[in-house]
């Protein structure tokens, strides 16, 4: 097999663009890029190009932006490029079997978990929320299922008690490109060994919703604190205070026997934070963001809104 593969790259966000950038520094030939149509963004709703398209145009790579890959006529662009392999990273569209079968070596996906754990749309956030101590990336041979294909390569990293989705995303954005290039090297050398997934060990990382981000004080302080880190930077955990949403950026778990207190009860608010009773333990909110304001230390917020935080008040 030639040392240089003809690659079509399919992706959208910065996470994907980092993988494309890594491939551009190799001996492989990126013959085309698939990415979704430009979307309106900002107040003016101007059409904006995503990071993958921007990188492709900078490097004079042909770009194709179909609204769907289901129509057969949309497959002709892919066929004409005669790819050895298609690499898919956070593309955001379904690839039908007819597309998966076009490249000589099929389609590879970079998935942000250690499969078969956390198949689905939000593996980074769900791993954090669940309290996992380890995650990573899996390079997978795509099939028609949802992240069910054979595993080709894995790279892992620890999840710390300080990690947010943003910091974990950054870790995986470092791991993924290296794992992908190693996988391609193994394919070329003929040393790659595929491993089937054990479906009995699989679980699903469902897409996040804004509704989930509202803090449920009946959960334990530990669960809520993990949720706060998992939902940072989107959609951001929040609570309601005098009918205003307040986003929570940072919090601490305080062990306490508070079984006689209603979850959501405000215990105290001082320069060290805002202490709220949960289903188990106390949550100390140390950094928050009132509606229409920038994130700030809780102590700074209290300077102007101390009257909002009367001990005994129930926080919604």
Curated annotation (Swiss-Prot):
It comes from the Bacteria. It is an enzyme of class 2 (transferase). It holds the Pfam family Formyl_trans_C. It catalyses: L-methionyl-tRNA(fMet) + (6R)-10-formyltetrahydrofolate = N-formyl-L-methionyl-tRNA(fMet) + (6S)-5,6,7,8-tetrahydrofolate + H(+). Its EC number is 2.1.2.9. This is Methionyl-tRNA formyltransferase. Attaches a formyl group to the free amino group of methionyl-tRNA(fMet). The formyl group appears to play a dual role in the initiator identity of N-formylmethionyl-tRNA by promoting its recognition by IF2 and preventing the misappropriation of this tRNA by the elongation apparatus. NCBIfam families: fmt (TIGR00460). PROSITE patterns: GART. One of its GO terms (molecular function) is methionyl-tRNA formyltransferase activity. (6S)-5,6,7,8-tetrahydrofolate binds at residues 113-116. Belongs to the Fmt family. Signal peptide: none annotated. Keywords: Protein biosynthesis, Transferase.
């Amino acid at each position: 097999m030639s040392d240089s593969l003809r690659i079509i790259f399919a992706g959208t966000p910065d996470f994907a663009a980092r993988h494309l950038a890594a491939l551009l520094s190799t001996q492989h030939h990126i013959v085309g890029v698939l990415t979704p149509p430009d979307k309106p963004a900002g107040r003016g709703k101007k059409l904006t190009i995503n990071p993958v398209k921007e990188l492709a145009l900078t490097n004079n790579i042909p770009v194709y932006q179909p609204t769907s890959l289901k129509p057969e006529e949309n497959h002709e662009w892919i066929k004409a490029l005669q790819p050895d392999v298609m690499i898919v990273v956070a593309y955001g569209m379904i690839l039908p079997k007819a597309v998966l079968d076009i490249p000589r070596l099929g389609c590879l996906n970079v998935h942000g978990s250690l499969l078969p754990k956390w198949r689905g749309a939000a593996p980074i956030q769900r791993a954090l929320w669940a309290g996992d101590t380890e995650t990573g990336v899996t390079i997978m041979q795509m099939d028609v299922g949802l992240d069910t294909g054979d595993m080709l390569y894995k790279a892992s990293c620890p999840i710390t008690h300080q990690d947010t989705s943003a910091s974990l995303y950054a870790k995986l954005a470092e791991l993924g490109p290296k794992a992908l290039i190693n996988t391609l090297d193994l394919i070329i050398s003929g040393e790659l060994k595929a491993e089937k997934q054990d479906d009995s060990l699989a679980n699903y990382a469902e897409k996040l919703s804004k509704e989930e981000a509202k803090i449920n004080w009946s959960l334990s302080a530990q669960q809520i604190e993990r949720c706060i880190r998992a939902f940072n930077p989107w959609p951001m955990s929040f609570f309601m205070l005098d009918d205003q949403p307040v986003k929570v950026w940072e919090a601490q778990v305080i062990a306490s026997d508070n079984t006689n207190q209603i979850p959501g009860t405000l215990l105290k608010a001082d320069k060290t934070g805002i202490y709220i009773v949960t289903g188990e333990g106390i949550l100390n909110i140390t950094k928050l963001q009132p509606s229409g304001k920038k994130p700030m230390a809780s102590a700074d917020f209290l300077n102007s809104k101390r009257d909002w935080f009367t001990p005994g008040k129930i926080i919604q």
